[in-house]
UniProtKB/Swiss-Prot annotation:
The lineage of its organism: Bacteria, Pseudomonadati, Pseudomonadota, Alphaproteobacteria, Acetobacterales. This is Histidinol-phosphate aminotransferase. The gene is hisC. The keyword Methyltransferase does not apply. The modification N6-(pyridoxal phosphate)lysine is found at K220. It is an enzyme of class 2 (transferase). Its cofactor is pyridoxal 5'-phosphate. Homodimer. It comes from the Bacteria. Its EC number is 2.6.1.9. One of its GO terms (molecular function) is pyridoxal phosphate binding. The keyword Phosphoprotein does not apply. Belongs to the class-II pyridoxal-phosphate-dependent aminotransferase family. Histidinol-phosphate aminotransferase subfamily. One of its GO terms (biological process) is L-histidine biosynthetic process.
Amino acid sequence: MSNPRPNPGIEAIHPYIGGESKLPGVEQVIKLSSNEGAFGPPPAAQQAYLKAVSSLHRYPDGGSHALREAIGRYFGLDPARIVCGVGSDEMIAHLCMAYSNPDSELIMSVHGFSVYEMYGHYAGAKVVKVPEQALTTDVDALLDAITPRTKVVCIANPNNPTGTMLPTAEIARLRASLPSDVLLVLDAAYAEYVDDPDYDPGVKLVDAGDNTVMTRTFSKIFGLGGLRLGWAYAPPAIVDVLNRVRGPFTVNAAVQEAAIGALEEPGWVERSRAHNSAARAKLATALFDIGIPTLPSVTNFLLADFGSEARAGAADRWLRTRGLIVRRVASYGLPAYLRITIGTNEECDLVAEALRAFMAQAPADSDAAS
């Protein structure tokens, strides 16, 4: 007698492991491992969430109508082309499942966000990872990987975990060169942090055609990671597909109210972005001065190069003993790097001071520092 077996591809999935938030024996922990907003949730979001508590016995608006209207007003988008879900990763999962199959291929960058591979395997598709140039998505490599079986291309722009971005012209070139029946998913989770004028999160391409989707999140600059809310902006036909496959009440009522409050907090994004840009530049300079180069980043994190896996591991252990949690990225094929979230000024200073002490005592390629 045989046991139940999952669909092909499921056993190829490596479960996603989020950034740690606690350390054994350490009371005061500073978490800089998950790229969460430095300032927490906006006050208006907190107030709206608490106000919603008295109505928790009511089912939420399954279509998130008021929230979609608020998103549309804030970003200047048509609410009818917005779909909300439990994090942008849920939107990406639905897109991969709806447009991929066991006879198809999903294309992604070799150091792209790991959920693309996860959901590609979930759909049974062959996942093809293409090389990058200087840890930046390579459009020519993506195009070279396209075959008649390709159905979905997933790109994070800016990319996690590298922090690098493709300019508007390169993304437009990618879309123009892809076959029209290939869905391009642009994951713009970090869009609000970008202050480069040569950047578009994907709105223009979504508006221009029928085969591109942009996904966004409230988990980063809006500080609502614990509530899990994301959204997609898509052509009408793809919106119809997402509304067919999404759950009926996935976005709960309190989350919808909190997100509307976050959008209504005056100047929140502008203040957060200004802080992030200044703190990121300061930390990058401090790390460079002690011999730790970082990749050029437009996000709320830095990818720091320690030169070897041994030294990166030693630095991580050194930070952990001091209550500082950053992110190992060996699972992304980057064993010599640590990803460091941009926190408050004080938190960034503590990281710089701790790593200065580490570099002062650590021999080259040491794995013994503690």
